[in-house]
Amino acid sequence: MRMELTDEEAADLATTLRGTLGDLSSEIAATDNAAYRDGLRARRASLERVLAKVEVSNPAVGT
């Protein structure tokens, strides 16, 4: 899939992803359920890959 984003949209997406990643890290640390924690870790890894792609496509959002 390909998406074209304006610089502003890319920056907004990166900001949202960073916030979500921070929230996920906190939730991973707080959960005692191993299966749920594994699912959260998988989601975090996926979102980290998306963020990396956004940052590579638009280096201005990497800050």
Predicted regions and their residues:
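N-terminal acidic leader/helix
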Residues: 1-23, 27
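Short, charge-rich amphipathic interface segments used for partner binding and complex assembly
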Residues: 30, 34-63
